[in-house]
Amino acid sequence: SHLPFGGVQLLMIGDLQQLAPVVKQEEWEMLSKYYDTPFFFSSRALSETFYATIELEQTYRQTDADFLDILNKIRQNKADKATLEQLNKRYMPNFVPPADERYIQLTTHNILAQNINERKLAEIDADAFTYTAEIKGKFPEYSYPTDETLTLKAGAQVMFIKNDHSMDKRYYNGMIGEIVTIDEDGFVVRSKDYHEDIQVEREVWENSRYVLNEQTQEIREEVEGTFVQFPVRLAWAITIHKSQGLTF
C-alpha cells in the first residue's frame, strides 16, 4: 500500500515533555537526510495523514494533590519559589530509614550509588559470590544493563532490572527483594511483591541497530551483540537516571 504507515491504523502513546528521543550518532547520520528532528512529529508519513489527538487528564499513579501540582509545575518548567519551599519542607537531613523497609537512596552519579552499595554489601557477614557476564559481539560498556562482574551475598538488597517474560511473571523491572540463598551457580530472591521465593536465572540483552537497505528502502533490525547476566543489581542506592520508569 502507498498509504501512510501502509494503511494500518496506528496508536501512538507518549509525552513530549519527557526526555527527548535517544538516537545513536550513526543512526542520525542516516535519518537526518529525511527528517528535520528525531521527534515523531517530523515524520513525513504523519504529515500526510489525518490524525486525532487525545490528551489524558486523569492521573492514577499519584493521588496527593499538592505533590501532583509540584510534578506538573516541574514538567511544564513553571516551578517557582513556592514550589521549592514545598520541596524543602520534606528535607530531613537526620532521617535514618528503618532497615526492614527497604528504602532506596537516589544519587546523582554512578560512583555515589556504587560506593553506597559496596559499603552496604561489605557490612554483611556472609560469603560473597561473583558472577561474570558473557558478552558477545559489539555491546558497549555504557549500555551494560548491570555489572559485568556482579558480586552478591545472602542478605543483599537487589533490584530486578528486567521483566520476567515467562508465563509466571515472577518479577518486573524495578521490583525489590533480598537474596535468601546463594551459591556459585546462582541465587534465590525473596520479595514482598511475589508469593514465593524466586530462583533467578540469567537473562539475555541484545544490542541492536537499524540498517537501511538502499535498494529496497526497507529498514531491518540487526543484532550486533549480546549481554548475558543475572537480571539484578545491588539496590541500596541507584542513580536518578536509572530509576526513571521503574516502580519501587
Residue ranges and their predicted role:
Residues 1-248:
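Conserved ATP-binding/catalytic motifs of P-loop helicase motor domains
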